[in-house]
Amino acid sequence: MALILDTGPLYASLDRSDADHAACRALIEAATEPLVIPAPVLVEVDYWIQQRLHPGALVALLDDIETGAYQVADLVGGDYQRVRDLCDRYADADIGFVDAAVLAIVERLDEPKLATLDRRHFGLLRPRHRESIELLPA
């Protein structure tokens, strides 16, 4: 098992001024399973780092990836069809590429939980690999 990280908790763990910093940092530091970042999440995190933090925060995150603190999960062939299906099915809910990609990776890796602050979208999405997924932090 692993803990999949969506954009919100990963970014909040880096930004000490973020309202969710303490909870997200604690969640990440307490994790005993591998921490997995879906590759599309890195693009969103980079955007928020460039907007709100010093670029050194991105370099530090990449260093952590390089040293194995985080694993990166790329999308693979069948994931793109699932992303397409999710974007189509939930079009009225403004489910975008990154959220759909995160769920596709959670499903492919058969994970029971997801670290996300996006309760609006992930509370709505229904995974196909289980009845529901646990959203953290609680």
Task: Provide a role label for each language-model segment.
Residues M1-I37, Q50-L62, R128-S132:
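Short, well-structured N-terminal submotif of metal-dependent ribonuclease cores
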Residues L3-D6, I37-P38, I95-G96, D118, ...:
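Histidine- and aromatic-rich ligand-binding microenvironments
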Residues D6-L10, E44-V45, R82:
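A general alpha-helix detector
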Residues G8-P9, P40, G78, R120:
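Alpha-helix/helix-capping structural signal
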Residues A39, L58, D99-V102:
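Alpha-helical structural signal
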Residues Y70-Q71, I133:
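Short, conserved active-site loop motifs that form the nucleotide-linked donor/cofactor pocket
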Residues V72-L117:
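Active-site neighborhoods of divalent-metal-dependent phosphate/nucleic-acid chemistry enzymes
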Residues L103, E107-A138:
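Acidic, PIN/NYN-like endoribonuclease modules and their adjacent C-terminal/linker elements
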